[in-house]
């Protein structure tokens, strides 16, 4: 079964989901979430604080162990609002690469919305008809 890992570095928390494709459906193998408050200082000062960076790196290292344990074939790491706005985002993405080997993809707000929509309509029962989707993200 092909196994995939998705990591979301958000403004308030980091999330990990590892899933395998089985009979044309995703089967969740592992999930994790850590509140890191990456965006808290960004929205006040324009930069990611050293404390938020360290908290996020700790979470990502834990996620990395889970990804290795589940032998994910593909890993996608995305970052959202706080990373789009932070003046020191590039330095932080280098730290992530150094700590985990992962490249962080800082996605646009439009791509973020597209991915949220795709996740809801492909996994939520009843989401294929008319519905309203509201993203209450941290950024």
Describe the predicted segments one by one:
Residues 1-9, 17-134:
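Nucleotide/phosphate-binding catalytic cleft detector across ATP-hydrolyzing
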Residues 12-14, 139:
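Conserved Rossmann-like nucleotide-cofactor binding loop
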């Amino acid at each position: 079964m092909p196994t995939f890992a998705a990591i979301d570095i958000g403004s308030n928390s980091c999330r990990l989901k590892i899933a395998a494709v089985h009979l044309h459906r995703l089967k969740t193998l592992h999930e994790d979430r850590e509140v890191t408050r990456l965006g808290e200082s960004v929205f006040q000062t324009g930069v990611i604080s050293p404390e938020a960076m360290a908290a996020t790196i700790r979470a990502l290292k834990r996620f990395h162990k889970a990804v290795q344990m589940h032998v994910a074939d593909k890993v996608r790491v995305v970052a959202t609002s706080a990373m789009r706005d932070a003046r020191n985002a590039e330095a932080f993405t280098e730290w992530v690469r150094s700590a985990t080997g992962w490249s962080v993809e800082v996605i646009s707000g439009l791509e973020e919305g597209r991915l949220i929509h795709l996740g809801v309509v492909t996994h939520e029962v009843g989401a294929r008809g008319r519905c309203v989707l509201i993203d209450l993200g941290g950024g």
